[in-house]
Amino acid sequence: MASITLTPSEKDIQAFLEHYQTSLAPSKNPYIRYFLKLPQATVSIYTSGKILLQGEGAEKYASFFGYQAVEQTSGQNLPLIGTDEVGNGSYFGGLAVVAAFVTPDQHDFLRKLGVGDSKTLTDQKIRQIAPILKEKIQHQALLLSPSKYNEVIGNRYNAVSVKVALHNQAIYLLLQKGVQPEKIVIDAFTSAKNYDKYLAQETNRFSNPISLEEKAEGKYLAVAVSSVIARDLFLENLENLGRELGYQLPSGAGTASDKVASQILQAYGMQGLNFCAKLHFKNTEKAKKRLER
């Protein structure tokens, strides 16, 4: 029988209770605030703030709090470095890349914290747990600002080679701190052949072999940690850039980005967009066309 213990926020607890209020049941245990009988699982919410989920459906209900079961592979049970990036698909904001070093004895702590791929967690949950991860987990975070991104793209780098450079540098700097991984995993964003081709132009190199794996954030907690910290760094940068310009900058590259981009273009010109956006995205031309209407 699966058993999962979590310590979520009171706000998340209340949201869970509201969602499953019809499953509330009495409990004689004086230390249990709420007890729920759900299909294939029971949930005990203790006065201490801890939550115990038991049963075949425990993982399903734990995912409400951001818990993600990580695939148990032989590689997962090694001290390893995992890397991930956030921001490459967003017009506004910089490009954040993080390398994190995780050891097997940290796995329980990370799962109880609710660590998972940043794409499966709410921004609120990410902002809540990222500071804890930054304090407890050895990592190296890099942020390429939009203006610097625009400076290097089209000159020395393209959209793929710049990510190779950042992932390589994050790993290199983390290794310089003395960590000793038995494996290094990168959440694959290109082929190994392409990665090696672009890596050849980088100065800082290391001898450790690397593995590029698709959906690595669901297989390795080190990659999941990097995903969360990178998302937090990206969101913080997005907020700071927007604050300086007086606009709320949306994430992504949809029509909302086109609209805000046209407003910034009208107010500040191309200099304003260069400050906060990745200019080679199609959103730039769409923003210009909006002003021509």
Curated annotation (Swiss-Prot):
Reactions this protein catalyses: Endonucleolytic cleavage to 5'-phosphomonoester
Protein's cellular compartments: Cytoplasm
Keyword Hydrolase assigned: yes
Keywords assigned: Cytoplasm, Endonuclease, Hydrolase, Magnesium, Metal-binding, Nuclease
Keyword Zinc: no
CDD domains hit by this protein: RNase_HII_bacteria_HIII_like, RNAse_HIII_N
Binding locations of a divalent metal cation: 84-85, 187
GO cellular component, one term: ribonuclease H2 complex
Domain RNase H type-2: 78-293
Free-text comment on the cofactor: Manganese or magnesium. Binds 1 divalent metal ion per monomer in the absence of substrate. May bind a second metal ion after substrate binding.
Cofactor(s) in the UniProt record: Mn(2+); Mg(2+)
EC number, UniProt record: 3.1.26.4
Entry-linked Pfam families: DUF3378, RNase_HII
InterPro entries in the cross-refs: RNase_HII/HIII, RNase_HII/HIII_dom, RNase_HIII, RNase_HIII_N, RNaseH-like_sf, RNaseH_sf, TBP_dom_sf
Biological process (GO), any one: mismatch repair
One MF term in the entry's GO annotations: RNA-DNA hybrid ribonuclease activity
Family label: Belongs to the RNase HII family. RnhC subfamily.
Its job: Endonuclease that specifically degrades the RNA of RNA-DNA hybrids.
Name this polypeptide is given: Ribonuclease HIII
Lineage: Bacteria, Bacillati, Bacillota, Bacilli, Lactobacillales
